Curated annotation (Swiss-Prot):
Protein name per UniProt: UDP-4-amino-4-deoxy-L-arabinose--oxoglutarate aminotransferase
Residue numbers bearing the N6-(pyridoxal phosphate)lysine modification: 182
Pathway note: Nucleotide-sugar biosynthesis; UDP-4-deoxy-4-formamido-beta-L-arabinose biosynthesis; UDP-4-deoxy-4-formamido-beta-L-arabinose from UDP-alpha-D-glucuronate: step 2/3; Bacterial outer membrane biogenesis; lipopolysaccharide biosynthesis
EC numbers: 2.6.1.87
Family named by the database record: Belongs to the DegT/DnrJ/EryC1 family. ArnB subfamily.
UniProt GO MF annotations: pyridoxal phosphate binding; UDP-4-amino-4-deoxy-L-arabinose aminotransferase
Annotated organism of origin: Escherichia coli (strain ATCC 8739 / DSM 1576 / NBRC 3972 / NCIMB 8545 / WDCM 00012 / Crooks)
Gene it is expressed from: arnB
UniProt keyword annotation of Ribosomal protein present: no
Length: 379
């Protein structure tokens, strides 16, 4: 059998090794100059005013919700077809996640679904830029402005995604992820961008014990050795080891995403003759980052179920992913919201399958996946 082809693999090279070595030899390995450089680079990439690096996108979501004073009695609108960390953070703060349906073919939350879910208790809206494509953020942001509700963009899949000519996160507040499978990675990490100066100040405090400054800031600017706690906070800062890797990856972003697009195009062309259904692309002008390439496997149409397809691909040495099992179908949320029905979400959650997609894949790797799909479709 051929070597196992994983669903994803980080594209690491000698540049990342050199970046880590530089930090280790510098004597400053926790939050420091590499963090500052990463934050500045994301301001430049997105065009936004403030960037706050954190230990994960989940940490970023947690403190953003906290900074917006979301808590008991509040509601936060989000799709169910997302990673559960968003729902978990809302719930842990005592608020209620209001899960809404998505478009059946793009899997994007729609402005109409969001607006229909608004109540006097709605405190925030969290749209997801799904799989590397952008949601219709202008329309969603307009709803937030009309009702006076904060919009927090889940941009975990969207490093390199553009909407109407502007990078995701160009305005408002957005949260990116640097997890191991993301378009750029530093193993674990995240970053928040915002154009709200007061929010940025609160986020910097909340990510580091509630202090007004961090250790590097104190050393650099000669401030008092013991900073003062301004509010209870967390330990969500990113180390310079991670930031250095992220910076190196960011310098490669154009190449990394170009390679993803090439593989995605190869899949698209082959799937045109197969019963497996890829996602539709959004109608608005955009640049897709191709974080994921997802097909829908309908047993009646394809002659095989999604789970059986994933197992058959595994037997052929090909890994796959599931992004995502709908949150409202998982035990805790199923029991908390027993009557919730989201037809488009449920139909897709039972059928979606993420194919291997990462920059170091070869054309032959993609051909191997395509050949396996052809065989499993009986062609």
């Amino acid at each position: 059998m051929s070597e196992f082809l994983p669903f994803s693999r980080p594209a690491m090279g000698v540049e990342e090794l050199a970046a880590v070595k530089e930090v280790l030899e510098s004597g400053w390995i926790t939050t420091g100059p590499k963090n500052q450089a990463l934050e500045q680079a994301f301001c430049q990439l997105t065009g936004n005013q403030h960037a706050i690096a954190v230990s994960s996108a989940t940490a970023g979501m947690h403190i953003t919700l906290m900074a917006l004073e979301i808590g008991k009695g509040d509601e936060v609108i989000t799709p169910s077809l997302t990673w559960v960390s968003t729902l978990n953070m809302i719930s842990l703060l005592g608020a209620t996640p209001v899960m809404v349906d998505v478009d059946r073919d793009t899997l994007m939350v729609t402005p109409e679904a969001i607006e229909s879910a608004i109540t006097p208790r709605t405190k925030a809206i969290i749209p997801v830029h799904y799989a590397g494509a952008p949601a219709d953020i202008d329309a969603i942001r307009a709803i937030g402005e009309r009702y006076g509700i904060a919009v927090i963009e889940d941009a975990a899949h969207a490093v390199g995604t553009y909407y109407k000519g502007r990078h995701i996160g160009a305005k408002g507040t957005a949260i990116f992820s640097f997890h191991a499978i993301k378009n750029i990675t530093c193993a674990e990490g995240g970053l928040i961008v915002t154009d709200n100066e007061n929010l940025a100040r609160q986020l910097r405090m909340l990510k580091f014990h509630g202090l007004g400054v961090d250790a590097y800031d104190r050393q650099t600017w000669g401030r008092a050795p013991q900073a003062e706690v301004l509010t209870p906070g967390y330990k969500y800062n990113l180390t310079d080891i991670n930031a250095a890797i992220a910076m190196t990856q960011l310098a490669k972003l154009e190449y990394l995403n170009t390679r993803r697009r090439e593989i995605a195009l190869q899949y698209q062309q082959a799937l045109a003759a197969l019963p497996f259904q890829p996602l539709s692309l959004p109608a608005w002008p955009h640049v897709h980052a191709w974080h994921l390439f997802i097909i829908r496997v309908d047993e009646q149409r394809c002659g095989i179920s999604r789970n059986a397809l994933m197992e058959a691909l595994k037997e052929r040495g090909i890994g796959t992913g599931l992004h995502f099992r709908a949150a409202h179908t998982q035990k805790y949320y199923r029991e908390r919201f027993p009557t919730l029905s989201l037809p488009n979400t449920e139909w897709n959650s039972e059928r979606i399958c993420s194919l291997p997609l990462f920059p170091d894949m070869t054309t032959a790797d993609a051909d191997r996946v395509i050949t396996a799909l052809q065989q499993l479709a009986g062609q």
